[in-house]
């Protein structure tokens, strides 16, 4: 296994935050509605993991270090894990497993539909994020995994719909997401290594 310490560090960080939040909830440090706080933090954590995952390819191109790509799948799976926990918090703490209320929520809060679509997309990517699926799908695998940018857009829209009144934090993530999308445009992606190469030659 390549870069085991980096993989271990990501695993520890991925576990640490939910465990710490659970500790805060157990100690009554999350206020009167700890379930909602947990749900919100896990959703935001998933968005952050998604942005970090999408930054791995540009970082590899900029630095030439293969470690970024090696941990990309692991980061993506942590994003999915946080989304699953986010969804479970919603089902248990917000709905109380009342499926009749779920239908009402869908009508009243369309952002839940947007979030559900993002979850379905992430589920498809998580299930196929293995070498077996790569071999079976062939060229279609890359096309499928480009869906991650649609998922990012859905995640940002879901977040925007929830915050509405205070857009400052949302704007930070939206700018980062937009920048990462621009870096994936073929014309831009081709120029980035050249720009870095020119800087390296100037510095030397």
From Swiss-Prot:
UniProt-recorded name of the protein: Protein-methionine-sulfoxide reductase heme-binding subunit MsrQ
Main subcellular location: membrane
Keywords for this protein: Cell inner membrane, Cell membrane, Electron transport, Flavoprotein, FMN, Heme, Iron, Membrane, Metal-binding, Transmembrane, Transmembrane helix, Transport
Membrane topology value: Multi-pass membrane protein
Job of this protein: Part of the MsrPQ system that repairs oxidized periplasmic proteins containing methionine sulfoxide residues (Met-O), using respiratory chain electrons. Thus protects these proteins from oxidative-stress damage caused by reactive species of oxygen and chlorine generated by the host defense mechanisms. MsrPQ is essential for the maintenance of envelope integrity under bleach stress, rescuing a wide series of structurally unrelated periplasmic proteins from methionine oxidation.
Transmembrane parts of this sequence: 10-30, 42-62, 75-95, 110-130, 143-163, 169-189
Domain of life: Bacteria
Name of one Pfam family that matches: Ferric_reduct
Cofactor: FMN; heme b
GO molecular-function terms, A-Z: electron transfer activity; FMN binding; heme binding; metal ion binding; oxidoreductase activity, acting on diphenols and related substances as donors
InterPro entries: Fe3_Rdtase_TM_dom, MsrQ-like
Cofactor note (record): Binds 1 FMN per subunit. Binds 1 heme b (iron(II)-protoporphyrin IX) group per subunit.
Native source organism of the sequence: Pseudomonas putida (strain W619)
Subunit and interaction comment: Heterodimer of a catalytic subunit (MsrP) and a heme-binding subunit (MsrQ).
GO biological-process terms attached to the record: protein repair
Protein family according to the UniProt entry: Belongs to the MsrQ family.
One GO cellular component, as annotated: plasma membrane
Cellular location(s): Cell inner membrane
